[in-house]
């Protein structure tokens, strides 16, 4: 006897609200912060999110009879209050692993943050966290090389690495750009960097920039004996152009290239990560456009999710905020996504906004890059917050030194070494940072003038995207 079905519309919660469900190790788990339209029950909205991000649609369809809907559907299994906000709640949803293409972060994000984010029954929705099951993690390529391989490749141990974004970011000729790179590397930096919007403009075509930067690297290395690099931005208008730039960087001997992973796209990023893995190039990732996606505390995608996504898609470095600089960043949240980038296993920790355990297995970690409005006075806090496996990247805080780029670079290295030594001696470097730098400044007029130049520069604005009250 043929099966029949009841045509029409029924409430989502009849099918997708399952508070008795116990998530499996193989499930994807997602936590959404949801603000429903007035009068819509929480259970109905949570179920609607589960449906619209998995198997459901607005009406019953006869083709449901052709599959095992109970197996493939997403399940809203828990609801929690958001303390301090009566209008919002957390919806926890489990998805079977078979809903997603292996190794495709694009597949995951298309489902979880696709049409459901435009659903009329929602005033706003934000993806706060995802638990990627280990079985899925193992299908992803991840970072091309990882932290230890980079340490060995660059021969840098026992301290954070130092970088600098060349300024002004736009307008320099390739020759003058290369000159700035040389001065910074000669002064003691480990890396210099293209800014996110440096690609191939009329005033500086990419091939010219690559050549002048590589000349600067080789000249500085000959003088100092130190291995250094410049993040050559391979981001381009098409994947074909991106690969051409990466290939040229490899041919001229560059150790590292760069990609804007959000504006460039996840497909392009994963492809470039695979290329870098096969060809021995490190991959630096800029997060341009993240503020559009993650800064609104009620709508979008939290940066901790973007950090997981990038680690799985592939990158050896990722800009991660600074806490102390000019860019948005809550300390607890920052510490949470720094752990997500580097550690093999991250336990649920609501004090850092981490909603699920996350196991990355043997996947290498990503080096967090502190960049944006930082200068020498921030060095003690940066070393304390980020630790050794990081890049501390001073753009204006290097090139803005009154005595020039090379001196600015040398000053940052002096300050870094002073802070690392003090930390290794057991000092509380955040608490004693001013004293540590002032004492070193007595023996370094270059450091002293830098401290004088930036002593009044602070970025003390309230954080827009704070951890929810219950997490503190």
Swiss-Prot record:
Binding locations of substrate: 115, 165, 169, 287, 319, 371
Cofactor(s) annotated in UniProt: Mg(2+)
Inducers of expression: Both mRNA and protein accumulate at 2% and 0.03% CO(2), but not at 15% or 0.15% CO(2) (at protein level).
Gene Ontology molecular functions: magnesium ion binding; monooxygenase activity; ribulose-bisphosphate carboxylase activity
Pfam family, one: RuBisCO_large
InterPro entries: RuBisCO (IPR033966), RuBisCo_large_chain_AS (IPR020878), RuBisCO_lsu_C (IPR000685), RuBisCO_lsu_C_sf (IPR036376), RuBisCO_lsu_fd_N (IPR017443), RuBisCO_lsu_N_sf (IPR036422), RuBisCO_lsuI (IPR020888)
Positions of Mg(2+) binding: 193, 195-196
Gene Ontology process terms (BP): reductive pentose-phosphate cycle
Annotated site, Transition state stabilizer, chain positions: 326
Residue numbers annotated as active site: 167 (proton acceptor), 286 (proton acceptor)
Superkingdom of this protein's organism: Bacteria
EC numbers: 4.1.1.39
Keywords from the named record: Calvin cycle, Carbon dioxide fixation, Lyase, Magnesium, Metal-binding, Monooxygenase, Oxidoreductase
PTM-bearing positions, type N6-carboxylysine: 193
Reactions this protein catalyses: 2 (2R)-3-phosphoglycerate + 2 H(+) = D-ribulose 1,5-bisphosphate + CO2 + H2O; D-ribulose 1,5-bisphosphate + O2 = 2-phosphoglycolate + (2R)-3-phosphoglycerate + 2 H(+)
Cofactor note: Binds 1 Mg(2+) ion per subunit.
Function: RuBisCO catalyzes two reactions: the carboxylation of D-ribulose 1,5-bisphosphate, the primary event in carbon dioxide fixation, as well as the oxidative fragmentation of the pentose substrate. Both reactions occur simultaneously and in competition at the same active site.
Subunit structure: Heterohexadecamer of 8 large chains and 8 small chains.
Family statement: Belongs to the RuBisCO large chain family. Type I subfamily.
Note: The basic functional RuBisCO is composed of a large chain homodimer in a 'head-to-tail' conformation. In form I RuBisCO this homodimer is arranged in a barrel-like tetramer with the small subunits forming a tetrameric 'cap' on each end of the 'barrel'.
Protein name per Swiss-Prot or TrEMBL: Ribulose bisphosphate carboxylase large chain 1
Gene: cbbL1
